């Protein structure tokens, strides 16, 4: 059985988002631990924050804190631990 690594999930996300005309920015915030890995801008004007994880891995407490802050502001945060992008790409329609 081949293990899927977090970086391969992230690369797949970037590639598939690009195919539909979107952009998956690498999101880094110096001095702020736990921000999601990617800020995904989709063609319909929708913005989604995506936390990439290896299969079965869970967000850290710092990441959960940041997810809650973004959610409280009305943003969508998705934890992605597979190459199944159905929770992200339908947002284009």
UniProtKB/Swiss-Prot annotation:
Molecular function per GO: metal ion binding; nuclease activity; nucleic acid binding
InterPro entries: tRNA_endonuc-like_dom_sf, VRR_NUC
Domain VRR-NUC: 5-84
Cofactor binding mode and count: Divalent metal cations. Mg(2+) is the most probable.
Keyword Metal-binding in annotation: yes
SMART domains: VRR_NUC (SM00990)
Superkingdom of the organism of origin: Viruses
Alphabetically ordered keywords of this record: Hydrolase, Magnesium, Metal-binding, Nuclease
Gene3D superfamilies: 3.40.1350.10
Cofactor: Mg(2+)
EC number: 3.1.-.-
Function, as annotated: Nuclease.
Protein name: Putative nuclease p44
Organism expressing this protein natively: Acyrthosiphon pisum secondary endosymbiont phage 1
Gene: 44
